[in-house]
């Protein structure tokens, strides 16, 4: 019942084939990768794994320390201090909060250590490099998918991301660029919206439960900013017998999300080549360790929230819809296999059988 909308790439690409060589760094060098949390499995299972693997390939003598702050900004700051104390010469940070993480970049700069912002921008004049997809376009694609699979007068729910994550605001801005004209014209109805602190699915579940109660289950579409929120919304609708009848967007294309897509319960997810993002960050890390120029790895320069110019590598983004979208992700994401997706209920779907 859902149209197979969107198969195109949404953003400029990075030529990761060019990110494969670097002069050997010193054996005593160490790079620290600071993860934000473990609620979303991608950070440890995909991003960190790909970053470590790339570092082992291009700079096998460099030590990589991986930290996880479990969504606590003070913990992330302490972990950064610990990494610096242990001799880290480059910090690769996925900030919990784009503002408070500036302390990390500023402290590192005082010790002559550069900071790379991975996925989420760090609003500091000392942010050296940023790698990310076009999240505005990603949010717009999420909203467009839901619009294309609803009709005039239908009521929508928006489950937004974490208010402290700068990406969440950009994703939402992309969604609003599509939705606001329709809301203003009365062609769609904004039934309920809420932020999701820490991208916590439990909070998203409570929000969706509240939405269904307030709207008496009168919901025809869910614009969800990531797969965790999508899964929470689907679980809430499952209890009301609505799962599979309402288009639900997402982001990250986790294994669970792809299984839900094959079952027709989640209908879209935005996918980014996380292995390419990790490869870009690893290659820049080695360039920084060696004191080498890295301008050839960055295709753009952007300004962060404090007006500082930051070298930027935009990566591709893909709007995956239905079984075709699942097939594309499996084909292009080395961290996900068909066997991983074709488990449980999904194993009985036409895609897997």
Predicted feature descriptions by range:
Residues 42-57, 138-142, 166-187, 203-207, ...:
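Short, solvent-exposed amphipathic alpha-helices that sit
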Residues 30-59, 64-78, 94-98, 160-170, ...:
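Extracytoplasmic "Venus flytrap"
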Residues 29, 163-167, 179-180, 280, ...:
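Hinge/cleft segment of the Venus flytrap/periplasmic-binding protein
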Residues 81, 93-110, 175, 193-260:
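Hydrophobic alpha-helical
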Residues 31, 76, 131-156, 170, ...:
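Hydrophobic alpha-helical segments within soluble ligand-binding/sensing domains
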Residues 57-69, 158, 180-201:
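Short beta-strand elements in bilobed, periplasmic/extracellular small-molecule ligand-binding domains
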Residues 63, 98-137, 148, 155-161, ...:
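Flexible loop/hinge segments that line or gate small-molecule binding clefts
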